[in-house]
C-alpha cells in the first residue's frame, strides 16, 4: 500500500513539473485574443510585433507582447491590456485613458508616460 501511494505521489509530482513549462513563444498575432489584436492594431499600427509569449495559468492564459519599438504589453486571458512598459521612448498616448493622460499633462507638462498598469478599474502610470 505504501509503495503504491509513493509511486502515485511521484507520478503526480512529475506530471505537475512537466506542465510548468507550457510557455509558447511565437510571432503570430493570430494566437492573441481578438481584443488584444484590435488594441495592438489601434495603438501600435506603425510598429511590428517582435515576440509573443503565451503562458497558460490554469484557466486564465496571459500574453506578453514585445513590440519592435521596445514597448512590452501584457494582456489577460480576455485580451485586455494589464501592463505596458516602454524600455526606450514612451507608451503611445492613444493607449492611455484620456482622463488620466489629461491629468498627467496638466500637472507634469512635457513628461511622457513610460509605463502603465491596470487592474480592474484602477490605472497607474509612470512618467
Predicted features, each with a name:
Residues 7:
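Catalytic strand-loop segment that frames the active site of acyl-thioester-processing enzymes
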Residues 10-18:
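Hydrophobic h-region of N-terminal signal peptides that target proteins for export
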Residues 61-88, 127:
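Amphipathic N-proximal alpha-helical interface segments
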Residues 1-4:
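Positively charged n-region of N-terminal signal peptides that target proteins for export
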Residues 18-22, 40:
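Boundary of Sec targeting at the N-terminus
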Residues 48-67, 112-127:
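A cross-family detector of function-defining hotspots
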Residues 27-49, 91-113:
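Short, non-transmembrane alpha-helical segments in secretory-pathway proteins
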Amino acid at each position: 500500500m505504501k509503495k503504491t501511494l509513493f509511486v502515485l505521489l511521484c507520478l503526480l509530482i512529475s506530471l505537475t513539473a512537466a506542465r510548468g513549462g507550457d510557455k509558447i513563444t511565437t510571432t503570430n498575432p493570430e494566437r492573441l485574443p481578438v481584443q488584444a489584436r484590435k488594441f495592438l492594431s489601434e495603438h501600435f499600427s506603425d510598429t511590428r510585433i517582435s515576440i509573443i509569449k503565451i503562458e497558460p495559468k490554469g484557466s486564465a492564459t496571459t500574453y506578453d507582447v514585445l513590440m519592435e519599438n521596445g514597448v512590452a504589453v501584457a494582456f489577460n486571458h480576455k485580451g485586455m491590456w494589464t501592463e505596458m512598459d516602454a524600455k526606450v521612448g514612451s507608451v503611445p498616448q492613444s493607449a492611455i485613458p484620456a482622463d488620466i493622460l489629461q491629468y498627467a499633462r496638466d500637472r507634469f507638462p512635457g513628461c511622457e508616460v513610460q509605463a502603465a498598469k491596470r487592474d480592474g478599474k484602477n490605472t497607474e502610470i509612470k512618467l
